[in-house]
Amino acid sequence: CARHGLMDERPAEKVERLLRPEPMTLAAAEKTIAMPIAKSCFGLGFKEEPLPFGDLRSEMLYELILCCICGGMSPLYRRLYDEGLTNPGFGGEVLRVDGCCCILFTGESDRPDTVRQLLLDEIERVRKEGVDREIFTLCKNEKYGQLIENLENVEDSASQMADFALAGQTVAQQITMLAGLTAEDADAALQHILRPERMAVMYIEPDGTAVEDEAEEETEE
């Protein structure tokens, strides 16, 4: 190694990701596919501006906004559940990778178009009126509890610390950042995210095979 100069000191190499600029237009506004599932599923996606590296603040703020709009404490979630329009697992999440960010809503429903319209109406209502202050505080407390709860388990704690470290932050910094988020921040963010012109919808219909499998299991029992 020394003979070939492999032991000599070299300047640190920096990995550079070559990402093509992502347009804010949609590749497709609607798509339907069939899969081996027992009940119809749907997904709504909103294309957002990519978040800079290490910007966990915006990601956390988006998550709090979703909690206010369709979380378990929101009036929309209660209505959808009480009227049987979707399953208990319906909810929203933030998906961010280098050069890309989107906000997703997924669930099971026999009336996905009704759910979509109710969701869009609720987004517009909250955009105009502002997030419910009490629900926002409850969502912040819930998020804070999740951060602390993960520290009680070795595996969860290690995973959480690694995720934050890869973004150049610590758990303590995340907790401080969470404490600094306000309902006014959410109101301001809602003016430029979750825009209907950047929304795409995916319908996933049963292909019939999953129903047959369930019938076979019931027969065996």
Enumerate the language-model features and the residues they cover:
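Non-catalytic beta-strand/loop surface segments
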Residues: M7-D55, C67-D113, Q117, T176-A200, ...
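C-terminal structural cap/anchor segments
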Residues: D98-Y144
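Short amphipathic alpha-helical surface patches that mediate protein-protein
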Residues: A2, L85, L120, E124, ...
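A common structural junction motif
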Residues: C1-P11, G84, D121-V131
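Residue-level signal for cytosolic alpha-helical hairpin/rod architecture
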Residues: Y62, C100, L120, V171-A172
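Bilobed periplasmic-binding protein/Venus flytrap-like ligand-binding cleft at the lobe interface
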Residues: M60-G72, L119-E124
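Short acidic/His-enriched helical or mixed secondary-structure segments at domain edges of catalytic enzymes
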Residues: T32, K39, P75, R79-N87, ...
